[in-house]
Structure formats: C-alpha cells, structure tokens
Amino acid sequence: MILILLGPPGIGKGTQASVLSDILKINHIATGDIFRKNFKENTELGILIKKIIAQGLLVPDDITNQMIADYLSKDIATKDFLLDGFPRNVLQARFLDDFFKNSHLFLTKVIYFNAGTQDLMKRIVGRRICPECGKVYHIENIPPKTPGICDKDQKTLIQREDDKPETFLKRLKVFNQETLPLVQYYREQNQLFEVDGMQNIDQVTKMILEVLETDRK
C-alpha cells in the first residue's frame, strides 16, 4: 500500500499520517525528516541544499526529487509507505510517477484534506506548543489545564512563527499556487479521495479507512 497525503498548512496531515501509519502498519515518510537526516549526516545532497537555503533560494525540484528517490530506494523493501510532504507540485508528481513505474510500485490512493481559509486560520492561530516536550495544544479545541502552561512539564507555551496569521497566509498562498494543482492532477488519474479536514481526527481517520477498504474489494 502506498498513500500520498495532500492538504494546506495547518490541516493536520502530520497527525493523520501518524495515526494511519500506526493502524495500517506502514512507514510514515515525511519529507522534512528526510531533509533533516541528510543535514545531520552531512550527505552530498544535504550539504548542497544547506548552501542553497543559506543563499535564500528555493531548493530546485531535481535536487528534492533525487533526495526522495535515494531514500525510497533504500527503504523500498517494504513497499508499504505513506508520503507526507511530497510531491509539492505537478513536476514532482510526474517524477514520482516515473519512479514508481521503474520500481514496479503502485500508488494506492491520494488523500486530500480540504478546508476553507477562515477555518484554517482559526485552527492555526489558536495553536500553542510546548518548547520543552513539543506537545501541541489549541486555546479552544485542546486547551491545557492551566492557560498558557504545558500540562506535562509546566513550561510556558509558545506560538510558532509559522502559526502567526501573516506567516500562515504566505504559506497558504504558496500552497494554492504550487500544490493545489496536484488535486486536479490526481483527480484526473482517478486516484484522489477528498475529505473534510476540519472534522475531528477520529472522523477523518474513519472515512479514510473506509475508502481504502472499499478499494481493496
């Protein structure tokens, strides 16, 4: 089984990726983790990407594609995984199609988590994180027992720069320009399943598992 998760920033892809990978017993492959691994190990690609980022430039598709391909080639033995954070545009999707074809792999489903801008904004700006343990709260939906304080280690909660309204809107603009066209790309391939990402976690998971089970029949 191979799944791809798509959705705007703040929709909860990472949370669903963790839940689904545990239930389905498949690997959760997050692009951010692959980048950090290459940085930490000072690989040739990792060093190159660091230089590009240091110049304030975007990492070219061909370099990102190569990093993903290298990782998947080493981890291909299981042939069961979930991609979170890749592809980000149609060119990357076409590269991935070719990679799957050459590796005799078959994409099971693309899950697209949809939501309106205002709903996303409300979710994002209310998010708070513990700088010590990383636990995520929301001032309305998942509040700590004591306002502004982590339940676990009593540290003062913070709001990430990415979660501030002006930063979020910039990230959303990039998503709409680059990643949103992927929805139509995969819809035309009859591989897309769209789900309301603003439902609670259990509801979203249930809907995804149901459509995957239907596809198996």
UniProtKB/Swiss-Prot annotation:
One of its GO terms (cellular component) is cytoplasm. GO terms for molecular function: adenylate kinase activity; ATP binding; zinc ion binding. The keyword Electron transport does not apply. ATP binds at G10, I11, G12, K13, G14, T15, R127, V136, Y137, Q199. The keyword Zinc applies. Residues 30-59 are annotated as: NMP. Monomer. Consists of three domains, a large central CORE domain and two small peripheral domains, NMPbind and LID, which undergo movements during catalysis. The LID domain closes over the site of phosphoryl transfer upon ATP binding. Assembling and dissambling the active center during each catalytic cycle provides an effective means to prevent ATP hydrolysis. Some bacteria have evolved a zinc-coordinating structure that stabilizes the LID domain. This is Adenylate kinase. Belongs to the adenylate kinase family. Residues 126-163 are annotated as: LID. It catalyses: AMP + ATP = 2 ADP. Keywords: ATP-binding, Cytoplasm, Kinase, Metal-binding, Nucleotide biosynthesis, Nucleotide-binding, Transferase, Zinc. Its EC number is 2.7.4.3. Pfam families: ADK, ADK_lid. Zn(2+) binds at C130, C133, C150, D153. Catalyzes the reversible transfer of the terminal phosphate group between ATP and AMP. Plays an important role in cellular energy homeostasis and in adenine nucleotide metabolism. Pathway: Purine metabolism; AMP biosynthesis via salvage pathway; AMP from ADP: step 1/1. One of its GO terms (biological process) is AMP salvage. AMP binds at T31, R36, L57, L58, V59, G85, F86, P87, R88, Q92, R160, R171. It comes from the Bacteria. It comes from Onion yellows phytoplasma (strain OY-M). Gene3D superfamilies: P-loop containing nucleotide triphosphate hydrolases (3.40.50.300). It is found in: Cytoplasm. Its main location: cytoplasm. PROSITE patterns: ADENYLATE_KINASE.
